[in-house]
From Swiss-Prot:
Coiled coil regions, renumbered to chain: none
Cytoplasmic-facing ranges: 1-91
Main location: membrane
Official protein name in the record: Anti-sigma-K factor RskA
Length: 232
């Protein structure tokens, strides 16, 4: 069983990932981490990795380093969770990505850093005032979608998802009341430890589903649904 002190340790993963602790606090966290149960230590490491990878995604999407204010937004998003004592290693990326989206909306990084070009789909989504974030497990890794109904688009980030077997592809499906519509495929060479893709024309879809399909994909899902992320 995970003890309350373990939850308290996990709550420190986000500020630790953002180097928002003093040297003394960092040493104390690392001491507690070395004595923590293996599952707790693994969850701590996963949250640290997720926060840092999400920050890297934003830097790549906007061609700029996230500003100091964005770091503060991340810390502020993590703060309320401390009173809830829930297993934040499963929800950390929600708060992190949502805070990033809020930060980008406030600071307009895409526009400021690319004045001579139209914002990319990723920049538009991340800067949208209605941006939402969902995340779930996919093939042993994590799939996170940041999406905007105003922009009718989304950004998919897959971390540590193993590539599909040779001769198959991951296929994404936008599902609405009429059924699934293909949102693209990813073959073995397209899937890396951190894979990014854009989703366009969300329409009235309420779910993003993932299946494994043969060859270069299918017109309708034929494989087992690996994951479903609600787009609500």
């Amino acid at each position: 069983m995970t003890e309350p002190t373990d939850f308290q340790l996990l709550e420190l993963a986000t500020p630790y990932a953002l180097h928002a602790v003093s040297d003394e606090e960092r040493l104390d966290i690392e001491r507690r981490l070395s004595a923590a149960p293996a599952p707790v230590a693994a969850a701590f490491d996963e949250e640290v990795r997720s926060v840092r990878e999400t920050m890297s995604v934003v830097s790549a999407a906007t061609a700029a380093q996230p500003p100091a204010e964005l770091r503060q937004a991340l810390l502020a998003a993590a703060e309320p969770a401390q009173s809830r004592r829930q297993p934040r290693w499963r929800t950390a990326v929600f708060a992190s990505a949502a805070a990033i989206a809020v930060g980008l909306g406030a600071f307009g990084l895409g526009v400021l850093t690319r004045p001579s070009a139209s914002p990319t789909v990723a920049e538009q989504v991340l800067a949208a005032p209605d941006v939402q974030t969902v995340s779930g497990r996919l093939g042993g890794g994590t799939a996170t979608v940041m999406f905007s109904r105003d922009r009718n688009a989304g950004v998919l980030v897959m971390n540590n998802v193993p590539p599909p077997s040779p001769g198959t592809v991951y296929q994404m499906w936008l599902v609405d009341a009429k059924g699934p519509t293909s949102a693209g495929t990813m073959g073995p060479t397209a899937v890396t430890p951190s894979t990014k893709a854009t989703l366009t024309d969300l329409g009235d879809s309420t779910t993003l589903a993932f299946t494994v399909e043969p060859g270069t994909g299918s017109t309708k899902p034929t494989g087992t649904v690996l994951a479903e992320l609600p787009l609500r």
